[in-house]
Amino acid sequence: MSHFFAHLSRLKLINRWPLMRNVRTENVSEHSLQVAFVAHALAIIKNRKFNGNLNAERIALLAMYHDASEVITGDLPTPIKYHNPKIAHEYKKIEKVAQQKLIEMLPKELQHDFRCLLDEHYYSEEEKALVKQADALCAYLKCLEELSAGNNEFIQAKARLENTLAIRQSPEMDYFMAVFVPSFSLSLDEISLDSLD
């Protein structure tokens, strides 16, 4: 008997942004799905508009599993995780142990297939960068949603993420930001009316 998927199903019980007041709580499971949507889109944009040659479906899968180890480690708040390089380095080691523990929950004949999704050492540098871009973009989108709902708790997080996005900047991310991101600050009525035109 394997407990792998029973563990993954508990990602929905782990809340993100645990030290901040949220208008709407976000869990790791729904965050992972949004990161998969965005990473998939970034890969397609890169391929279609900027001469990329990425497997968009693989990118989506990598994004789906990118935070799977948090079912064991929990979601450590960013200010703590990146407080200094030593903490960040040690946390990476903890994540690696958690990834290995998840992999060992699988039947032996499936372990390699999932190791390639759970362990970022199996990602190409381009795949890793794209998933990190999507992850940061989704955190930024969360900030926009919270701010548009009147929650000023996310002002500093938004500023920090703008710096992160500037560092991870790419043509496909610029395209996504210009075409898709503005809608996240609009109401349902505004995006619905615009869609009917």
UniProtKB/Swiss-Prot annotation:
It is an enzyme of class 3 (hydrolase). A divalent metal cation binds at H31, H66, D67, D135. Residues 28-140 form the HD domain. The keyword Hydrolase applies. Belongs to the 5DNU family. It is found in: Cytoplasm. GO terms for cellular component: cytoplasm. InterPro entries: HD/PDEase_dom, HD_domain, YfbR, YfbR/HDDC2. Its main location: cytoplasm. SMART domains: HDc. Pfam families: YfbR-like (PF12917). GO terms for molecular function: 5'-deoxynucleotidase activity; metal ion binding; nucleotide binding. Catalyzes the strictly specific dephosphorylation of 2'-deoxyribonucleoside 5'-monophosphates. It comes from the Bacteria. This is 5'-deoxynucleotidase YPTB2590. It catalyses: a 2'-deoxyribonucleoside 5'-phosphate + H2O = a 2'-deoxyribonucleoside + phosphate. Homodimer. Substrate binds at R16, W17, H31, D67, D75, L76, P77, T78, D135. The record marks R16 as: Appears to be important in orienting the phosphate for catalysis. Its EC number is 3.1.3.89.
